[in-house]
Curated annotation (Swiss-Prot):
It comes from Herminiimonas arsenicoxydans. It is found in: Cell inner membrane. SUPFAM superfamilies: Gated mechanosensitive channel (SSF81330). This is Large-conductance mechanosensitive channel. InterPro entries: Mechanosensitive_channel_CS (IPR019823), MS_channel (IPR001185), MSC/AndL (IPR037673), MscL_channel (IPR036019). The chain crosses the membrane at residues 9-29, 32-52, 80-100. Signal peptide: none annotated.
Length: 137
């Protein structure tokens, strides 16, 4: 079998195609969660804590003014952008929780499926067993 035929057989297998679809859907779902965190959750959290935008929280690692925005501060030197980290951490926790729930649901569905019936014993095997039993007598 040539290399191209082997690759085609590998690529067409269900698991590889399923994995590719999962990666694409996961990328799109990640963008939805990003939007959920940045556009809905973080503004509410910011409002609770006095209208602050967490994504602009940083500590300068040099002698620069802390009243600058994060983008301006990054242009002037190194910064410890802990607000951005908090936002990304919340994003990750939401995504991990949703994926955990999906895996949990799929496990329950798999457990509830009835086990597959064993294939019927081939007639040759049945015949050989009968011959064996007859010879034992």
């Amino acid at each position: 079998m040539g290399m191209m035929q082997e690759f085609k057989a590998f690529a067409v297998k269900g698991n590889v195609v399923d994995l590719a679809v999962a990666v694409i859907i996961g990328g799109a779902f990640g963008k939805i969660v990003d939007s959920l965190v940045q556009d809905i959750i973080m503004p509410v959290v910011g409002k609770i804590f006095g209208g602050l935008d967490f994504s602009n929280y940083y500590l300068p690692l040099n002698n620069q003014d802390i009243s600058l925005t994060l983008v301006e501060a990054k242009k002037l030197g190194a910064v410890f952008a802990y607000g951005s980290f908090i936002t990304i951490l919340i994003n990750f926790l939401i995504l991990a929780f949703i994926i955990f729930q999906m895996v949990r649901m799929l496990s329950k569905l798999k457990r509830s499926e009835p086990p597959a019936e064993a294939p019927a014993t081939p007639e040759e095997v049945v015949l050989l067993r009968e011959i064996r039993d007859a010879l034992k007598k």
